[in-house]
């Protein structure tokens, strides 16, 4: 379904998963913050820890398991909610600010979108097909303005969804101020 985008608000999303393949891996954590066109958060957002299947947890490779152990996420999974409940919470949060057509935003957002599409189809249905991927802007800065790229904020989120969302917003704000400043 193609819905018209909401012109000013951006729906920032980050997911933590058991791996990168939505056909076999599952969601562990989802964070969403809605901002206005000036990248100012409308509120604190929503962060949900999801309870994955024991099969998905057991299939995590060592690198991913270590990453989620160090971040503390694995310790929180016992208090996670079913993905259906997480979907309802995320949808309720988004529709508080954007009825339909929210532009999904974040870093390397295509992977997050695949997981949202598979595990949260009701959320996917209210998002526009367009996306703002900060990592694409970063790649342009690397090639066209390395001096600007070198001044970009360092990421410290430690693979936790809300920290990653907030860092992505800050990173786009940096590129907006320093890189996307031309006039026509």
UniProtKB/Swiss-Prot annotation:
It comes from Tropheryma whipplei (strain Twist). SUPFAM superfamilies: Ribonuclease H-like. Residues 10-172 form the Exonuclease domain. InterPro entries: Exonuclease_RNaseT/DNA_pol3 (IPR013520), Oligoribonuclease (IPR022894), RNaseH-like_sf (IPR012337), RNaseH_sf (IPR036397). Its main location: cytoplasm. HAMAP family: Oligoribonuclease (MF_00045). Belongs to the oligoribonuclease family. The keyword DNA-binding does not apply. GO terms for cellular component: cytoplasm. The active site is at 129. It is found in: Cytoplasm. Its EC number is 3.1.15.-. This is Oligoribonuclease. 3'-to-5' exoribonuclease specific for small oligoribonucleotides. Transmembrane segments: none annotated. Keywords: Cytoplasm, Exonuclease, Hydrolase, Nuclease.
């Amino acid at each position: 379904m193609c819905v018209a985008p909401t012109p000013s608000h951006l729906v920032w999303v980050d997911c933590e998963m058991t791996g990168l393949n939505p056909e076999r891996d599952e969601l562990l954590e989802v964070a969403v913050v809605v901002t206005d066109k000036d990248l100012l958060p409308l509120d604190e957002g929503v962060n949900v820890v999801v309870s994955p299947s024991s099969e998905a947890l057991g299939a995590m490779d060592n690198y991913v398991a270590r990453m989620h152990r160090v971040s503390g996420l694995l310790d929180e999974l016992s208090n996670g909610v079913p993905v259906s409940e997480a979907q309802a919470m995320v949808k309720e949060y988004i529709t508080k600010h954007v009825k339909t057509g929210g532009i999904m935003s974040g870093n390397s957002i295509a992977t997050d979108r695949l997981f949202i599409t598979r595990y949260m189809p009701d959320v996917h249905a209210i998002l526009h097909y367009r996306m703002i991927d900060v990592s694409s802007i970063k790649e342009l800065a690397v090639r066209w303005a390395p001096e600007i790229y070198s001044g970009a904020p360092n990421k410290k989120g430690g693979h936790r969804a809300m920290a990653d969302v907030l860092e992505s917003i800050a990173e786009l704000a940096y590129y907006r101020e320093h890189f996307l400043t031309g006039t026509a």
